[in-house]
Design a protein with these regions (language model features):
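N-terminal basic, amphipathic alpha-helical segments
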Residues: 1-125, 129, 134, 145-147, ...
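Short beta-strand "wing" residues that participate in macromolecule-binding interfaces
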Residues: 71-72, 160, 412
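Conserved core of the PLP fold type I
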Residues: 132-266, 277-296, 450, 454-462
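Hydrophobic residues in well-ordered beta-strands that form the structural core
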Residues: 191, 212, 272, 343, ...
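Conserved core segment of the aminotransferase class I/II
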Residues: 297-360, 458
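Short hydrophobic/aromatic beta-strand micro-patches
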Residues: 315, 389-391, 432-434
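Conserved glycine-rich beta-strand-loop-beta hairpin in the small C-terminal domain of fold type I
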Residues: 360-371, 379-391
């Protein structure tokens, strides 16, 4: 869709003119007057219509792009992009009925973790380390915790050392800290066209521009990354190459090798988010091992152990250590010592390995269940992934399906929440199979989804 005649109503807007234009643009997008994929007027045309300078419109579009409202590409134009976010009712504090099945947020299934946390905290409370754990620690983490982090990272096949590992307050904190260390405000970061929404939040906080890169059924396309890098403006590539969220693709080795060479050729930092990699046995080597001099490898305990631990680990090139440590100091000062100590105990005594094996086995079983119960539907995923994409039949829109599913007592997430591309987002929803505590809840949720797929979309035309 094209709306080259769009002219904002600035009468109700306040502040600098460029910001007023960006605010009006946001208002028209929210109101539905500018749907996703709408092509906007050129800088010059809008400046002529508004009787302002081209520089003012350029600043307005840059501000709108920083907010995640639009994306532009030289030679193609400027387009409205999706701005949906994951709307997990549990995180929003919405009251959930006892029969509601939440498949919205990627969380590992819970088993013996509460009892293990209670036991571990009792042991820490009775240990001689307790007093020290209540004090300030090094910004990068205690030596013992960095050593445990290095051991945990080494499970992926990446060679590292405690000197190259920093302890963070979750994988999300690691993403923001690394991006802060390798970019400046206004820089461009390449990402998959479908990507983890947390990187959008980090980019907005740091005033970074996200440039979506095309994918196929195997993941990121190296030739698309190379084409983007040839423009000379890309400072970093953020990617989830193993059990990608939300597509669950595993990037083949040959593409990883190609990305490493492209990054070297163009001086691009590689930010590898591997929070799901623990679920895959014998997967391809991490990107960080293929281009170690420019790679940042991120993992955490949120998916492998428990989200409430909020402990992450990041492997960095030695020369970048102090910059990432400075970002941690500026944001969290240090990861919570008590939780870091608990994670270290679990890594050292084998508890973490046992939890991983339990989660692997359960996810494989739940994936098999989903494919049996949704047989006949188009599904994208991997047998080891905690999530999958359900592609919707003709007539359904992803947002309408999400709303209808919620009314039927099951939470799913429209692919719009992950989409940064310039065209219409994939007409699919993500199902997170690890969230329900019991497998019987997964069955109940999948039954409701299967029943909804059999209903004609016309029955839900009340969803706007």
């Amino acid at each position: 869709m094209t709306n080259l005649n769009w002219q904002p109503d600035l009468a109700q807007q306040r502040g600098p003119l460029y910001r007023a234009i960006a605010d009006a643009l946001a208002s028209d997008i929210r109101a539905g007057r500018l749907p996703v994929g709408t092509r906007l007027p050129t800088h010059r045309d809008l400046a002529w219509n508004l009787k302002v300078t081209v520089g003012t419109v350029t600043r307005a579009y840059a501000e709108a792009e920083r907010r995640g409202l639009i994306s532009g590409e030289v030679g193609r134009g400027t387009y409205v992009r999706p701005t949906s976010t994951i709307t997990d009712p549990a995180l929003k504090g919405e009251p959930l009925g006892p029969d509601f099945v939440d498949l919205c947020l990627n969380r590992p299934q819970t088993g013996e973790e509460p009892a293990l946390v209670a036991k571990g905290l009792r042991e820490i409370a009775e240990s001689p380390d307790l007093e020290a754990l209540l004090q300030y620690q090094p910004h990068a983490g205690r030596a013992i915790d960095r050593a445990a982090g290095a051991r945990w990272i080494a499970r992926s096949g990446l060679k590292t050392s405690p000197a190259q590992v920093l302890v963070t307050q979750s994988g999300q904190n690691a993403v923001a800290s690394v991006l802060s260390a390798v970019t400046q405000p206004g820089d461009t970061v390449a990402v998959e066209s479908l990507t983890y929404p947390g990187v959008r939040s980090a980019a907005s906080l740091l005033s970074l521009r996200l440039a979506p890169v095309a994918m196929d059924e195997h993941g990121l396309l190296p030739e698309a990354v190379a084409a983007l890098c040839r423009g000379g403006s890309v400072k970093a590539l953020y990617t989830l190459p193993t059990l990608h969220n939300p597509t669950a693709t595993v990037l083949p080795l040959e593409r990883r090798l190609a990305l490493a060479e492209i990054a070297r050729a163009h001086g691009v930092a590689l930010v590898e988010d591997d929070v799901y990699g623990f679920l895959l046995k014998d997967g391809p080597p991490p990107l960080a091992g293929l281009a170690p001099e420019r790679s940042f490898y991120i993992t955490s305990t949120s998916k492998s152990m428990a989200p409430g631990l909020r402990i992450g680990y990041v492997h960095v090139p030695e020369e970048a250590h102090d910059r990432v440590a400075a970002a941690l100091r500026a944001t969290i000062y240090m990861a919570t010592p008590l939780m870091a100590a608990l994670a270290t105990r679990w890594i050292e005594d084998g508890t973490a390995d046992r939890l991983v094996e339990q989660k692997r086995a359960e996810i494989v079983a739940r994936q098999k269940l989903a494919r049996e119960m949704l047989a006949g539907s188009r599904l994208s995923g991997h047998p080891a992934a905690p999530h999958l994409l359900l592609w919707l039949p003709e007539g359904w829109r992803a947002e309408a399906f999400e709303a209808a599913a919620r009314r039927d007592g099951v939470g799913v997430t429209a692919a719009t929440a992950f989409w940064l591309g310039r065209s219409n987002p994939p007409n699919a929803v993500r199902l997170c199979l690890g969230t329900p505590v019991r497998r019987a809840e997964v069955v109940r949720g999948l039954e409701r989804i299967a029943a909804l797929l059999k209903r004609p979309p016309e029955a839900d035309l009340s969803v706007i």
